[in-house]
């Protein structure tokens, strides 16, 4: 089978992956990470950590003995406290597609994130964070019936966790960047002040313009700051403009076709 090297199935919010370390002794991966950050800082480079707080590597009891469940992350401690659940107490994959969406109605789950950010900032020395599917951190599952999916999907700009993270960033002089969408919604421009946001509108408009799609007005709007979408919660200085990322095709492929063909082999 294929090896999962993507890095988006978080097992622990506090530990670097031992597989990437040369020194695999007790504490070795942590020491190496700290040394790496120090070396980058000495060269004048900041380090931003891509963090996945929307789900964990928690699995289920499928694909094996149905009477046996393996706990790999938070499920063995207090699954009902950390995870969104259906009325029948099954894990939810709605916003993440991973069957283990975290529940940020829970103060315990909120504190876990804040403690993790403190650890990576104070102990490991990173300069900022990019939050994968950050909209999950702005939802309040417990404010709706467990089967009321319309209300489950609501996003709260003033969510206490989003506000606390922005305050933490200001206090520690670090940057926090949201991937401001998930499978339940697109919230670019809606994060509170103190957050920067990946701008998917900029990405899409520039890609289309480069291909000659004729979207000149849209292109000019995003290149000039996307003011219409960022005016309310901090202004266009919040937008993180990008064209390509780890998800999807590389930049050369993006401008080398006329019609999409996702079935073509690599």
Stretches found by the model and what they are:
Residues 142, 147-152, 156-266:
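Conserved alpha/beta catalytic core and glycan-binding cleft of carbohydrate-active enzymes
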Residues 1-125, 130-165:
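Substrate-binding/active-site clefts of carbohydrate-active enzymes
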